[in-house]
């Protein structure tokens, strides 16, 4: 539609539509017309593409045909779910006027705005996953970041100091919708995300943000939340809260405070580490064979979501971790028994959010009632458990006898989906409702009596009384007897073989019945809203209870997993180091068909770095990752897959494991590898756990070995981080002779003829040889290629043995007798087929400068 179209050139209905659309220019407007929601103009074209619905035309307005698309009102939720998954938003416009009394178009207004980050309807949400709305702010001092889960009221803020930390936060929280200011500079950080919303700068104004937040929480200042001076975070939080108020168009009583998340409270993991450890998402983007897939057998959706939050935010507070360990130990004997009533509790957290937003449906209230009915059994099971943390959680669970009684009296056993058609409020709850219902429900008896009376009085055996939606109540007589009806019978409808009549008595009763049905429905809707008013004052205790029930679910789940998977309770020490006896990889051991070979690990201030050698497929990466996962699980408070484990203080986990070309950002494998390595060397500390796998393999041997050597040296002598350093460069196995705190370990294999058996067991000392050719044969490389490779290997080995510089130290790292010129080295490493024309031109200039 052209901007200069005048409103008055359109029909009255289209004028109404265009006024409403002008208030929501950037989102799809679903405009209720009878039994359909219609979309017009550009909205119709977009919706037809996004939702795969027909694009038609509706007459003409202002002299032009109007593009139109529509969806039936009863299936709107399915279409909204699809839009939300695509990161789109929609405004829902309803008819609020009465068509019977309206002059001109029926009055309509937008009653809700559905956006990916503000949905609370269970049909639109993924049950076992948090759905977050986030806002981001950035200036010279760093970033401000706020997240809100509207389906629980959980409001968090943080102030990431730099781009890498901000990227890690975005990956950890994975918001469904992200608000950002119009002058946001590092767009590369967010541009690949769904659900981006550009907001004007004034929405991030600091004083307005403080005012909005104090108003929401009913406080004079934000000191009690520890965020008064967090100006960057508050700007983001203010914009986020305003956006939620604008879209929800209702009060938000379940959002009662906000929490500042500080990096030092948890173990810091960057985006690469989270990806490499496959916590909740595997490297292919799925959820199979992840740590969560093995660990999450929670019986409530809210417990499952909490466990995933724990996985992504391991904590360092020994007191909290010890509480969790003791609770898991205390629950092991009753875990299965406790999970039975917990399973019946369901998703109380999200039901309470819908209650707060006054969008809870009748079945939500029935589920809440069912949850309350489980609490006595949960109390019975947990009261004998003599663990302080369990008893503390039990006191938070509480009992809600009065609310349970209210819902048992007020709501029918199996309520309908919507309150719209009535039948939700139970008989006996309200005397006036029962009277009006009796009138409406008494219609059947009355009609039966009327039919018998009239048939006998008039002697017409074909006479019967009925009802249809168009003509209401009627008396029907066959065509053959219609001449016998009395004069006060007024003809209402003629059929092929019968006539239908109305009499004053029946008309009077019809009016009374229809009035009583309407009256009963109005009373019922009023009572339903009244139940909300009776429940809402208890919202804080109910939210506390839901949170405690979710944590009990997580702890019972971890207790069951520990028992089933043979995990042990780790010791959390304040002395630096990691000592693991019989450690296993929690995911690989479940996927493997043969028994998993467990392995020990010792890291300490005197043994800070392990140089790990051994064949490809020998288990180096598995050994490294299992160490990180055991450390991470220990900082959940969980038991760990090991015979015994003692874990000292850890501040960060870094992984440089495997890489693929980051084509979207135009970065090669080697560039990705070096970027991640630089991040580690800049940010690791003495208390960090660092996994380095095959550093330098993305470039030439000469460069690669130099880089690997320098990185290992730096980590061991300057940073002194606890490091697992897997490598194929056997020259690195001489490092322990030159530096203190470095040791060699290797994974063994046995070669028999042309076959190879991987032992998967970690031994002290360096590997005696590489098994690259045996692995190549195993992978199906043709035998003649393997044979030629063996010949070449012998030639190279003899050349290497004759070389003058056969040993390496930090000052001289010559691999061959003569140094290869850099230009030749670069050319050898170059793959011409992978270069774009522009990259090829750049390389010509680069090589020219090298010569």
UniProtKB/Swiss-Prot annotation:
The keyword Heme does not apply. This is DNA mismatch repair protein MutS. NCBIfam families: mutS1 (TIGR01070), PRK05399.1 (NF003810). ATP binds at residues 614-621. PANTHER family: DNA MISMATCH REPAIR PROTEIN MSH1, MITOCHONDRIAL, DNA MISMATCH REPAIR PROTEIN MUTS FAMILY MEMBER. The keyword DNA repair applies. This protein is involved in the repair of mismatches in DNA. It is possible that it carries out the mismatch recognition step. This protein has a weak ATPase activity. Keywords: ATP-binding, DNA damage, DNA repair, DNA-binding, Nucleotide-binding.
